[in-house]
Design a protein with these regions (language model features):
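A membrane-topology feature that recognizes alpha-helical transmembrane segments
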Residues: 1-151
Length: 151
């Protein structure tokens, strides 16, 4: 007892870093949801640095490149998606691709679309902020991917 190996220290540091990053992502998520719900925009100050970081991460984790499909789909669709949605799709797509591959990215895209469509139908609205749906779907799919990998 009392032995503390380098492996133990590394595991504790990794757990602490993971907890910090998860908390930071949660705070970022709340900020984006509130901003998009109130103002119908996702500001560059909250989306661009994270999107650029996600692209840089792809150089170190090549599985992330497939996540750019989400942003590409929004660029191709054009109408209905703002620049903030595209930048957010870069970040969320890369993270989901790293966590769960192309299946996670597609699940995130489909779930976000379903959430926004449901909001439009229930509210009988013609427009809706899409960022909250994207973020909710990314959290759900991210947790599901993590859980499924542990099983």
């Amino acid at each position: 007892m009392g032995e503390f190996s380098a492996e133990s220290a590394t595991a504790i540091a990794a757990a602490g870093l993971s907890a910090f990053l998860c908390a930071a992502a949660a705070v970022w998520t709340v900020g984006l949801v509130v901003m998009d719900a109130r103002e119908r925009r996702l500001p560059d100050t909250l989306t661009l640095p994270v999107a650029l970081t996600a692209v840089v991460a792809c150089w170190f984790e090549p599985r992330g490149w497939v996540g750019l499909v989400w942003a590409a789909a929004y660029l191709i669709a054009g109408r209905g998606f703002g620049g903030g949605d595209v930048k957010l799709a870069v970040s969320l797509g890369v993270v989901l691709a790293i966590m769960g591959g192309v299946e996670a990215v597609l699940a995130g895209m489909l779930l976000a679309s379903a959430f926004t469509a449901g909001f439009l139908l229930l509210r009988r609205a013609k427009t809706a902020p899409h960022g909250p749906s994207m973020l909710a779907s990314a959290w759900i799919v991210g947790f599901a991917s993590t859980f499924l990998l542990m099983v």
